Amino acid sequence: MVRSPVPAAIVFDVGSTLVREDRYWASWADWLGVPRHTLSALVGAVVAEGRDDAEAIRLARPGVDVRAERRAREAAGCGERLEESDLYPDVREALGALRALGMRVAVAGNQSARAGELVRALGLPVDEVATSGQWGVAKPDPRFFAHVVDLARAAPHETVYVGDYPALDIRPAKAAGLRAAHLRRGPWGHLWARTADAALADWRVDSLTELARLMGTGTGASRSVG
């Protein structure tokens, strides 16, 4: 087998890629006064229909102003926060291994500017962190991926974008000329693992540990999803 060159840069999505979202939605359920399982099921239902996950909040409390509720949560000390325990267990080791390969490692996802600050505060072994809130444009907009290329400081074909949500992460990344890795974890990673969008990925993995190993061995073929 011919060993492929290690890509110059790799950029990671945040939610369900680096960070578990369990506590985030649990805190929203508690704030709204609905059972956690109820809100979790609503989130799954609206996203499966291709709608924004904020619609789950509106279904749980009809007529609610989500932006106003976010401000109220912040004022009450219940706003966005991110802790070490919110990271998936493989994150630090895998990011460190990728940097050790000489890759530029960055983070860029559909999050608020505040969430970007929280990710930076974790001190992950990455070169840079950016968010859609910072850029003023979100996935799957091609302009988001133009920013990703700038963040990577590498040509699109030498840059890998990693995410769990094929329609937001894989398809638009490939359309922008990047390489892409689909991470099969979190609700959306499992739900859409067999879609045409997921099949576009250059790599299809179940963990960041597996991805780092494949990068290190120069394996470029997509793995099958059984």
Which stretches of residues belong to each language-model region?
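Asp-based, Mg2+/Mn2+-dependent phosphohydrolase catalytic module
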Residues: M1-I10, R92, G96-G226
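N-terminal helical cap/lid subdomain that shapes the substrate entry/recognition surface
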Residues: V2-M103, S112-G116
